Amino acid sequence: MSAWLLVDAGNTRIKWALVDSAADGWLAEGAALHADAADLAAQWGTAFGAAPPLRVLAANVAGTAVRTRLEQMLAAVAPGAAVEWFASSAQRAGLVNGYRNPAQLGCDRFAAAIGARALAPGRAVVVANCGTATTIDAIDAAGRFVGGMILPGLGLMASSLARNTAQLPQIQPGALLPSPFADNTDDAILAGCLSAQAGAIERAFARHGAVECILSGGAAPYIAPMLAQAPLLAGALRHVDNIVMKGLHAIVRAEGDPC
Ligand SMILES: Nc1ncnc2c1ncn2[C@@H]1O[C@H](COP(=O)(O)OP(=O)(O)O)[C@@H](O)[C@H]1O
Ligand SMILES: CC(C)(COP(=O)(O)O)[C@@H](O)C(=O)NCCC(=O)O
Ligand SMILES: [K+]
């Protein structure tokens, strides 16, 4: 069984995992901010040892310059590896893409939906990926990506207030507040942004009639405590590290090792 390198290049961070096609075949993982992307070569060198992967499956929504940079690094650390730049299509790994133009759907969202389907087969699911943007997508019990929402992520929401107002400061992400009705500016911003994120997820969950809500992404740890208090989501909330990567792994498992 040969190893695959999976890459999820989002707008803030590049995440990767080294896997094989077994269900529990998660061998190593790592991440770097775009500014520190050069660190990936060292991370990969350590993870690969003397056996670089022969196949790479990469989802990139961070633009062509990032893709070119990754191609150069991959050529150095895994020379000769076959690289597939994952793109949204009408159907893949048992998931049907309901976007009017399937290729327009962010490939990270399609991969996340494939991951959600793999984790909750035959169930109506909402998958919220809380990264630079927050995406909240609906997958039905028959395995169709129905559609979804895109909103500014938690960090973007907060920083847009700081950038576009005279009096509001840049806040740091923080823990759940005891009350949504804050008595100071920093907490009022945090309460507003967290409530907007959690509220959109709850609303999508209710509207879709979902039975499971998968929460992922770098901002998920801040949003999860608020969702955990939502009666609507009782017993239905599941925090999954990097659902995009889980989806790419599901594709590798579904399609197997080419001979
Ligand atoms: N150490 C960190 N560095 C950067 N962002 C972080 C960090 N910890 C949490 N975050 C939050 O996670 C978001 C990035 O999450 P991630 O899922 O990696 O996004 P993307 O897939 O868009 O690159 C940031 O916008 C921020 O809200
Ligand atoms: C919505 C996104 C910006 C999310 O990116 P991320 O927050 O993961 O960096 C990305 O999925 C994207 O560029 N989508 C293309 C448009 C669409 O999905 O309709
Ligand atoms: K996202």
Cite the ranges covered by each PLM segment.
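N-terminal glycine/serine-rich phosphate-binding loop of ATP-dependent small-molecule kinases
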Residues: 1-92
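Gly/Thr-rich phosphate-binding beta-strand-loop-beta motif of the actin/hexokinase/Hsp70
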Residues: 1-26, 116, 120-145, 161, ...
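Glycine-rich phosphate-binding loops at beta-strand->alpha-helix junctions
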Residues: 13, 59-66, 191, 210-227
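Adenine-nucleotide phosphate-binding core of ATP-dependent small-molecule kinases
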Residues: 30, 177-213, 237
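Short hydrophobic/aromatic-enriched beta-strand-loop microsegments
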Residues: 78-85, 145-151, 232-243
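Active-site neighborhood for divalent-cation/phosphate handling
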Residues: 82-127, 133-134
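Glycine-rich phosphate-binding loop plus the immediately following alpha-helix
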Residues: 105, 112-124, 146-189, 251-255
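Glycine-rich phosphate-binding/hydrolytic loop that grips phosphoryl groups
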Residues: 236-259
